[in-house]
Amino acid sequence: MIELVDVCKAFGRQRVLNHLDLAVEKGETTVIIGRSGGGKSVLLRHLIGLMKPDCGQVLVDGQDLARMNNRQLKEIRKSFGMLFQDAALFDSMNVGDNVAFPLREHTRKRRAEIRDIVEEKLASVGLSGVSDKMPSELSGGMRKRVGLARALALDPHIILFDEPTTGLDPLMADAIDTLIRDTQARTGATCVVISHDLAGAFKIAHHIAMLYEGRIIAKGTPDEIRNTEDPVVRQFVEGRADGPIKVV
């Protein structure tokens, strides 16, 4: 289980996370929604230990990432996979080497075993036979799939997704959402997804949490969020400019 308890983070006078509390259920997908620039990516960086909170705890299976040193963080990150917003592939490496990268960095597996794992992970995202291609030869959707294959390389029990459908057309976005949903169901991983794509959020989430003014103001099942009476959440979900959220 992942739990953020009373987490604060400020940059100068701007408080981005304001005594935030959030529990992410084990083996489920939680999608975090909220306005652009509202702190969702900052929250995600805390979940993987790339940022330390000014106050509060970031608990992963009861261990506080905020109190870990670099060696401890490196060890616990082996249980994480992350799909970055732009897939973050190494342009100088072919697809196979991109997927193999965490295996070479964090394990002592033999070359043949790594090759087999790479092909297995690529097949699991529908990309068999592309190991020798370069990232520049791939479409945006294919790059996202390769990024997911790399995120799965170490069989993580926690997978983080940063805007996984940004920049994709609606058909490809739906395909990526389906892949995320199926991957979670197959692996049983705990997934945290940062997203503006409300249609995708309602499709893949077990729970949806809304971040607003530095706090999680609502969390519930897709149906609970869709039918909420909270005026802030309702305005955001309905995509209306008029309401308590000021649009400037």
Regions found by a protein language model. Name each.
Residues 48:
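Helix-to-loop junction immediately C-terminal to a conserved catalytic motif
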Residues 134-138, 142:
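Conserved ABC ATPase signature
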Residues 63-64, 111-129:
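Conserved ABC ATPase "signature" region
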Residues 159-162:
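Catalytic Walker B motif of ABC-type/P-loop ATPase nucleotide-binding domains
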Residues 153-157:
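A short, proline-enriched helix->beta-strand linker immediately N-terminal to the Walker B motif
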